[in-house]
Curated annotation (Swiss-Prot):
Gene Ontology CC entries for this record: extracellular region
Signal sequence residues: 1-23
Annotated family: Belongs to the non-disulfide-bridged peptide (NDBP) superfamily. Short antimicrobial peptide (group 4) family.
Tissues/organs with expression: Expressed by the venom gland.
Proregion residues excised on maturation: 37-68
Recorded domain comment: Amphipathic peptide with an alpha-helix structure.
Source organism of this protein record: Euscorpiops validus (Scorpion)
Keywords annotated in UniProt: Amidation, Antimicrobial, Cleavage on pair of basic residues, Secreted, Signal
The protein's name in its UniProt record: Antimicrobial peptide Eval418
Keyword Transmembrane assigned: no
Main location: secreted
Protein function: Probable antimicrobial peptide. Shows dose-dependent and time-dependent inactivation of herpes simplex virus type 1 (HSV-1) and dose-dependent inhibition of HSV-1 viral attachment to host cells. Scarcely suppress an established HSV-1 infection due to poor cellular uptake.
């Protein structure tokens, strides 16, 4: 019974440490974002250029060739 209680307490302490470290990293990231500002972080998403709404006939033909 003592061993089970000790294992439970160690597991609770480790889980609490993980939860607190996640909050710490979140605060550090928010501080860095605040220092850089919105202009510095505006163009971090490179996937915006990938999703183009306007596909030409050549683009569609190229995609068809890729899918073969």
């Amino acid at each position: 019974m003592r061993t089970q209680l000790a294992v439970l307490l160690v597991a609770l302490v480790l889980l609490q440490m993980i939860a607190q470290s996640e909050a710490l990293w979140g605060e550090i990231w928010n501080t860095v974002k605040g220092l850089i500002g919105k202009r510095g972080l505006r163009n971090l998403d490179d996937l915006d250029d990938v999703f183009d709404d306007d596909l030409s006939a050549a683009d569609l033909e190229f995609l068809k060739q890729l899918m073969r």
